[in-house]
């Protein structure tokens, strides 16, 4: 779970850095996601290396700050789109601040916070998050995150007219994964989730491969990688696809909890 939170935080750090640099940090609040995502990434590394079965207050605070930053960022992006001429038109949805992007740091915070709740579970006891079974709760969070990330990818790939057939993968594979996680979350104990586990691995691979496809997309712009300083800003966002990998890792962690604790 800490690795999942860290993967999401790293994606946000790189993506928001590029996009907000392109926007010249016109609003000073645009520095916030960079600072918070860097803190969240460092916190996830600390959590991964910490073997103590006790929640850490500083990690909790950082993860909650990340979640709050995601909510606030969504509000800023909604305002940015709504204030433009035409409001929530296709043109503005395509080219103004991406509505779904800040939710990635929210998800990083939620997954990280869940990891701390699982960590503080006593041996032999069912891991819970606010009295809810931990595995099923995390599966629901990861599934919802996959649907939201699919919506963001679908909007931008629709803008690109799906000119490459592989652009259909991020809008077809993740919803299936979300349904599988929802089924796992709603199902009873003792079920075999082998296919769902395999599908999460497929989504993780898709997220990594997506960064490669985006790198190829950058190379197709005028000047290719020789003109990287311009094309990396205007080409497909390199750090965006790994967010699918982060959510897939969270899904795998949820399935692992349900395997070890059938009632979790």
Regions of interest found by a model, annotated:
Residues 1-264:
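Short amphipathic, positively biased membrane-proximal segments
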């Amino acid at each position: 779970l800490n690795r999942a939170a860290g993967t999401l935080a790293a994606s946000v750090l790189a993506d928001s850095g590029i996009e907000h640099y392109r926007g010249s940090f016109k609003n000073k609040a645009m520095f916030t996601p960079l600072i918070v995502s860097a803190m969240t990434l460092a916190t996830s590394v600390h959590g991964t290396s910490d073997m103590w079965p006790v929640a850490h207050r500083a990690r909790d605070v950082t993860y909650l700050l990340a979640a709050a930053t995601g909510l606030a960022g969504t509000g800023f992006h909604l305002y940015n789109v709504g204030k433009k001429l035409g409001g929530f038109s296709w043109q503005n949805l395509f080219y103004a601040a991406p509505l779904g992007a800040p939710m990635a740091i929210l998800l990083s915070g939620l997954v990280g916070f869940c990891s701390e709740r699982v960590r503080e579970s006593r041996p032999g006891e069912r891991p819970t998050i606010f009295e809810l079974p931990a595995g099923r709760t995390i599966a629901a969070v990861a599934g919802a995150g996959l649907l939201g990330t699919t919506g963001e990818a679908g909007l931008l790939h629709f803008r690109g007219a799906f000119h490459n057939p592989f652009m259909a993968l991020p809008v077809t594979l993740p919803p299936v994964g979300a349904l599988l996680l929802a089924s796992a979350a709603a199902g009873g104990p003792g079920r075999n989730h082998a296919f769902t586990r395999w599908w999460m691995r497929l989504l993780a691979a898709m997220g990594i491969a997506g960064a490669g496809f985006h790198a190829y997309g950058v190379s197709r712009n005028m000047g290719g990688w020789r003109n990287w300083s311009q094309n990396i800003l205007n080409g497909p966002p390199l750090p965006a696809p790994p967010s699918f990998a982060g959510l897939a890792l969270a899904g795998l962690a949820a399935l692992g909890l349900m395997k070890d604790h059938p009632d979790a």
